[in-house]
């Protein structure tokens, strides 16, 4: 049995989120919470909230025990990019890409 949590349109580059997801993929849920608590990245806050949601889904919807859960899959896909322009000297304009991402966490029970 697996429980899933998805965060869509998170205003953060998927490349930055993947750095944090690589730290917790395959880990026990309690160990992952400890890692995320002391990870000094903005993406850690979003992933922590998403992990809480996935654990709550597992406990409430599937009656799984929190102590036996681990993160089986964790991935971040690119969301839509907001394109903005930054004015520069002599009539020029440079484009700024404000990237977003869709983050998915799947927790399973260890056999």
Curated annotation (Swiss-Prot):
CDD domains on file: Ribosomal_L22 (cd00336)
Molecular function terms, GO-annotated: rRNA binding; structural constituent of ribosome
UniProt-listed GO biological process terms: translation
Keyword Electron transport annotated: no
Entry-linked SUPFAM superfamilies: Ribosomal protein L22
One Gene Ontology cellular component: cytosolic large ribosomal subunit
Keyword annotations of the record: Ribonucleoprotein, Ribosomal protein, RNA-binding, rRNA-binding
InterPro entries according to UniProt: Ribosomal_uL22, Ribosomal_uL22_bac/chlpt-type, Ribosomal_uL22_bac/org-type, Ribosomal_uL22_CS, Ribosomal_uL22_sf
Source organism, top-level taxon: Bacteria
PROSITE patterns listed in its UniProt record: RIBOSOMAL_L22 (PS00464)
Subunit organization: Part of the 50S ribosomal subunit.
HAMAP family reported in the protein's UniProt record: Ribosomal_uL22_B
Family classification: Belongs to the universal ribosomal protein uL22 family.
Stated role: This protein binds specifically to 23S rRNA; its binding is stimulated by other ribosomal proteins, e.g. L4, L17, and L20. It is important during the early stages of 50S assembly. It makes multiple contacts with different domains of the 23S rRNA in the assembled 50S subunit and ribosome. The globular domain of the protein is located near the polypeptide exit tunnel on the outside of the subunit, while an extended beta-hairpin is found that lines the wall of the exit tunnel in the center of the 70S ribosome.
Protein name as it appears in the record: Large ribosomal subunit protein uL22
Annotated gene: rplV
């Amino acid at each position: 049995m697996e429980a899933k949590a998805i965060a869509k349109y998170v205003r953060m580059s998927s490349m930055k989120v993947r750095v944090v997801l690589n730290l917790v993929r395959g880990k026990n849920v309690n160990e992952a919470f400890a890692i995320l608590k002391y990870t000094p990245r903005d993406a850690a806050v979003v992933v922590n909230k998403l992990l809480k949601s996935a654990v709550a889904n597992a406990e409430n919807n599937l009656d799984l025990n929190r102590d036996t859960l681990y993160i089986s899959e964790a991935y971040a896909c690119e969301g839509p990019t907001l394109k903005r322009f930054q004015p520069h000297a002599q009539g020029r304009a440079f484009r700024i890409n404000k990237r977003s991402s869709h983050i998915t966490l799947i927790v399973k029970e260890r056999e």
